Amino acid sequence: MIFIDACFGKPTPYTPIWMMRQAGRYLPEYMAVRDAAGDFLSLCKDYKKASEVTLQPVDILGVDAAIMFSDILVVPLEMGMELKFIKGEGPVFENPILSMDSLDKLSVEKAVKNLSYVYDTIKLTREKLSSDKALIGFCGAPWTIATYMIEGGSTKTYNISKKMLYDNPQFLHAILRKVTNALKLYLEEQIKAGVNAVQIFDSWASALEQNAYLEFGFSYINELVDYIKSQYPDIPVIVFPKGISGFLNKIGGKFDVFGVDWSTPLKMAKETLGSRYVLQGNMEPTRLYSKDAIDDGVDEILSIMRGHRHIFNLGHGILPDVPVENAKYFIKSVQEKSAKYCK
């Protein structure tokens, strides 16, 4: 698999490419399946439909890897929290975790068992996916998941989580430990079901200053990575802590690939981390609105990475109103243009 070879820094005939949120609303085929499922959460829980939308970007765009269709918040949902997706508001947990009593009611074992629909999605997808295409599993990072559990949903200020961090750090650590323990087993079950690589998304890493993030954020990512690599050394692990360009020199661990977000200069990331890790990313997602902008972005990134120790991706998820034709153009452009650098 070209994607797996690239994750381990091996030579490839061209730079492999996939996109975060590639199974998503920009595809009419995805919207048809989502409408048939009824709502987003129902789609996540219907393994046949979830597998169908997982495969769509491979069939329609020609990406080099599929990423299983799910959501990072199914873990706290199946631990025992009540989750709703409200139109215009996003995910909402009706009873946030603000006391030890509420945390004690959440079950790691229950979550790992109840997430069987995710494992079924993986098994079915791996059966249908071409043997030369990788299937990526994923989870949210403990910090990002914990913010939703504490805040009760999306937030711009993280004031409840941050108050807890400084006022009651022991309790925040207790939440993070429990979430991390669930994620260890969750990723392990994904691997047993057939994923070829895993990615850990820390979407809200930038909410914390350096020292706080290293203690409450990245240390738990590394605990998760250490567990997976100790059990499954041949499974590549990708980390994606968004928005921490100010302290990349403080980042290290046993992961294989570091995901670079679009706000981080790729040349700086290469100079800081490129000798230790394969880099993934990092084209600005809005470039996909224009084929000229796609050309410029692809050329710039390829000139920096030169076809080595690199997986092409966007620097965040593809946006819902990107024309499918432009997404196809992006994928084909990377695959064709990168070949000359990989000789």
Swiss-Prot record:
It comes from the Bacteria. The record marks 71 as: Transition state stabilizer. Substrate binds at residues 21-25, 71, 148, 203, 316. The keyword Lipoprotein does not apply. PROSITE patterns: UROD_1, UROD_2. Its main location: cytoplasm. Keywords: Cytoplasm, Decarboxylase, Lyase, Porphyrin biosynthesis. GO terms for cellular component: cytosol. GO terms for molecular function: uroporphyrinogen decarboxylase activity. It catalyses: uroporphyrinogen III + 4 H(+) = coproporphyrinogen III + 4 CO2. It is found in: Cytoplasm. Pathway: Porphyrin-containing compound metabolism; protoporphyrin-IX biosynthesis; coproporphyrinogen-III from 5-aminolevulinate: step 4/4. SUPFAM superfamilies: UROD/MetE-like. Catalyzes the decarboxylation of four acetate groups of uroporphyrinogen-III to yield coproporphyrinogen-III. NCBIfam families: hemE. Homodimer. Belongs to the uroporphyrinogen decarboxylase family. This is Uroporphyrinogen decarboxylase.
